[in-house]
Amino acid sequence: MSRELTLQERLDGEAGPDPLRQAVKKAVAALAQAAIDISDLTCRGALAGITGEAQGRNTDGDVQKDLDVRADQIIRDALGALPIAVLASEEMAELDILNPGAPISVAFDPLDGSSNINTNISVGTIFSIMPTPPDASAAFTQPGSAQLAAGFVVYGPQTSLILTLGQGVDIFTLDRVERVFKLTGSMMQIPADATEFAINTSNRRHWDLPVRAYIDECLMGADGPSGKNFNMRWIGSLVAEAFRILVRGGIFLYPGDARDGYEDGRLRLVYEAHPMAFIIEQAGGGASTGRKRILDIVPGSLHQRVPLIMGSIKNVRRLEDMHTGPNVALEANAPLFGHRGLFRV
């Protein structure tokens, strides 16, 4: 049986002598070490003093948990001495400009899904690595297509690191005995078509017509236009949803809706949508707002929110067609939601 390649070995093989790739290698290695430390905390839970209690709100108005703060500091400590121009954390209001002449800049969500801590559901870390432009303060005003690398970590039954360096997607699993990440999935490919969707259906009444139409079509199953029966999944953890899509396909939707503050969804472009879109596209999937490719969007602000639809390419394209074509009219005729259906609207 062959020995599993470690993350460090994979990074060494990819970097070569190029200074930019060397900087990316060092940043990813440091983020991986930080993830091991965060994994230790999440695994110990209350034994490590992790209560899941609110510590206030971050600058964007979201409740900030105790582990959010600790995870943020762990990552900052890991990256602080590296050749990095700018750090941007979802937990902080402003950029942290470290070394304006350094070749890369790193954005991260230190603990995505922290509201799940008390219920023992998977949480994670998400990161994006950008080239530093001449004006370092503009590092995160570049489109997502400029990313050099992106990844996320799932702290679940296993701790898994999902990584793209722009040439496919690999999965590394934490070996807790040796305390290193080892390659367990290489060149991941998302099935082009799948029969699982993930969305919080309790918000249906607030959705735009195209989203309603698409979900109604899924619920119609084999009796509807798709001719297939779908299953619904909703974990409420972006990293867990993305991992499931990577290994077995499906579509994830966090759309904008009619509620105050939800017009553009709730996910951040820089910290969540851009890195997830890069990973999903590198695995053969699609990522869109419904009307625009996520990786084409240029951030207008550091904490900008954006609707996110991602997953199997045919499923994503179908929903995009519903945003731009005549199929929205189908929504009113969906049998499950029509005047003779199970649910009246």
Swiss-Prot record:
It holds the Pfam family FBPase_C. It is an enzyme of class 3 (hydrolase). Signal peptide: none annotated. Mg(2+) 1 binds at E90, D109, L111. It is found in: Cytoplasm. GO terms for molecular function: fructose 1,6-bisphosphate 1-phosphatase activity; magnesium ion binding. The keyword Cell membrane does not apply. Pathway: Carbohydrate biosynthesis; gluconeogenesis. Binds 2 magnesium ions per subunit. It catalyses: beta-D-fructose 1,6-bisphosphate + H2O = beta-D-fructose 6-phosphate + phosphate. Transmembrane segments: none annotated. Its EC number is 3.1.3.11. One of its GO terms (cellular component) is cytosol. InterPro entries: FBPase_C_dom (IPR044015), FBPase_class-1 (IPR000146), FBPase_N (IPR033391), FBPtase (IPR028343), Fructose_bisphosphatase_AS (IPR020548). It comes from the Bacteria. Belongs to the FBPase class 1 family. NCBIfam families: PRK09293.1-3, PRK09293.1-4. This is Fructose-1,6-bisphosphatase class 1 1. It comes from Nitrobacter hamburgensis (strain DSM 10229 / NCIMB 13809 / X14). The lineage of its organism: Bacteria, Pseudomonadati, Pseudomonadota, Alphaproteobacteria, Hyphomicrobiales. The gene is fbp1.
